[in-house]
Amino acid sequence: MNKDRQPRFTVIIPTKDRAEYLKHTLRTCALQDYDNLEILVSDDGSTDQTREVVEEAGRKDPRIRYVTPGGCVGMRDNFEFALDQVKPGFVIAMGGDDGILPYGVSRLADFLLETGLELAAWPAPMFSYAKARMETGQLVLHRPRKSRIVESSIFLARQVETLNYIADIESPMFYVKGVASTRLVDQVRRRSPEGRFYVCPTPDGYSGIVLAGEVERFAFSGEAYTIYGTSPTSQGLGYLANDQEAKKRSDDFFKHVSAVPMHPELAGQPYSPLITVMTVDYLLTARDLPGWPGRFPEISMSRMLEKSLAELAHGLYGGDRVLRELRILDQIAGKHGLRDEFRRMVQSTRRFAAKSPFEGDGISSDRVFIDCTRYGIHDLFDAAYAAYCLGNLAEKATPGSIARAFAGSVAYRLRSLRKGEPFPGPASWSEGEQGVD
């Protein structure tokens, strides 16, 4: 890696009709204390105030710039267009409701210079606006973790085992939770059809898998630099929600991605939002790139069908969405001579009752849930500061530091109660009795 003390960073923000949330995203970008930084907002034909929001932010901070592919090209092509505008250095991609934590870019630059690697990941916290996933807003923080070097071969083998790219905290996808050098991005482009980087229907998880295969190892930082945001306009929520407006948004999205079928081993089916299926599509697509050096074990299609069905049974999908995914899985099963087995799986599997996400304050083995509405965290900018401060507190508040704080407090209290010397006697300060007229 170039040892320049301030390597160039570009944050691309492909977006469409998210002006209400984008303004808070850009506030988190503008607060960065790093000069060699460019924020590129690529607008895919928004009909709201997106351009005005970006240009107003750009007048205040020249690091922020508005670009557009010139029409409604769809998410995938908008990402590719934005990536085309990036100058040599490092790149991070975000959505129009994601953000950067305070001092995020400068801290990330220090980490990359320390490791000397061109690919890195971190545990990004997650913020949900009120009314997005639930009535109240929510901030989710990961428990403190240690930084480490990850072997790419181990990471890729784990993707085959779990078939759940999005749950892998070490995934180096440069969408919100990772960063990549433009040299690695260009390396993938040279292997890809038509010189594109984004060759799968959706752009996020593929980047982590294909880039991991380009290097022997990459860095994982226990410190977060960015934050995921979820708003009512988020694409993933559009498919899980069952109201008519959400269905319309997801139908519009499918129209754009239908031109890019999944891998031939997935029967060339249209895009599926099932994480299991997407993980397999990313793996197979990367594997087939000419000269791609990544390696992973053979994928069991029977296991993929089983895990996909379990995901579909989780109670988050509405009835018509379930039917669509079952049809896709049935075609994939038929491609591999597993249709009878798959239909037996369907007959023997029971769906969970419809459920809502966890709401309120809570804690699990690896995450902390904070009710943002209760604590006055209203938007992504607020959440970014809260995540940064709470993350620092969690990292530094070790059992040892807590014990030292308690011991110091006790020692101070004991010193304050200790009896000292008595006051000097009257002879040393009295001027004698004075008469009163």
What are these model-predicted stretches?
Residues 123-124, 226-437:
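C-terminal subregions of glycosyltransferases and related glycan-biosynthesis enzymes
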